[in-house]
From Swiss-Prot:
Protein's organism: Aeromonas salmonicida (strain A449)
Subunit structure: Contains catalytic and regulatory chains.
SUPFAM superfamilies linked to this entry: Aspartate carbamoyltransferase, Regulatory-chain, C-terminal domain (SSF57825), Aspartate carbamoyltransferase, Regulatory-chain, N-terminal domain (SSF54893)
Cofactor: Zn(2+)
Binding residues for Zn(2+): C109, C114, C138, C141
Pfam families reported in the protein's UniProt record: PyrI, PyrI_C
Protein name: Aspartate carbamoyltransferase regulatory chain
Extent of the signal sequence: none
Alphabetical UniProt keywords: Metal-binding, Pyrimidine biosynthesis, Zinc
Length: 154
């Protein structure tokens, strides 16, 4: 492999690659989406060179295929990211991310009076983008929050 084509992070045989993550968001994605709880090997690159972003983060998860729904939840933090499905070291599918209609079980509602804090229910937020601002509305208390406030509370 020539120096120009050398990978910055080791290739995987089977699994998922989350690419084009804005620098600094990789750790947040690993924590919020509980990716580090898998028993599979995860390879992470932080602040890698990127022509489009300047710097980017990259996450490779072996033997795990992220679904389109799971991939789209990442759009809250990395709207321009792609999720590549890898088989035998080759990309067999690419997910271009879109904001999901809803997201469940990932965040806690910031409203301390929300019933979701005291009942055994998964969090559920309806996701909307209005004038370039992503807002998440809790199903239970019906309060809306920007995604950065919701993620800070987790």
């Amino acid at each position: 492999m020539s120096e120009k084509n050398q990978l910055q992070v080791e290739a995987i045989r089977h699994g998922s690659v989350i690419d084009h993550v804005p620098a600094g968001q990789g750790i947040k994605i690993l924590k919020l989406f509980q990716l580090i709880e898998t028993q599979e090997r995860i390879t992470v690159g932080f602040n890698l060179k990127s022509g489009a972003l300047g710097k980017k983060d990259l996450i490779k998860i072996e033997n795990t295929r992220l679904t389109a729904e799971q991939a789209n939840q990442l759009a809250l933090f990395a709207p321009k990211a792609t999720v590549n499905i890898i088989e035998d070291f080759a990309v067999v599918k690419k997910h271009q991310l879109e904001l999901p209609e809803f997201i469940t079980g990932v965040f806690h509602c910031p409203n301390s009076n929300c019933i979701s804090h005291n009942e055994p229910v998964d969090s559920y937020f309806r996701v909307r983008e209005v004038k370039g601002v992503v807002r998440m509305k809790c199903k239970y208390c019906e309060k809306s929050f920007t995604q950065d406030i919701v993620s800070e509370r987790y």
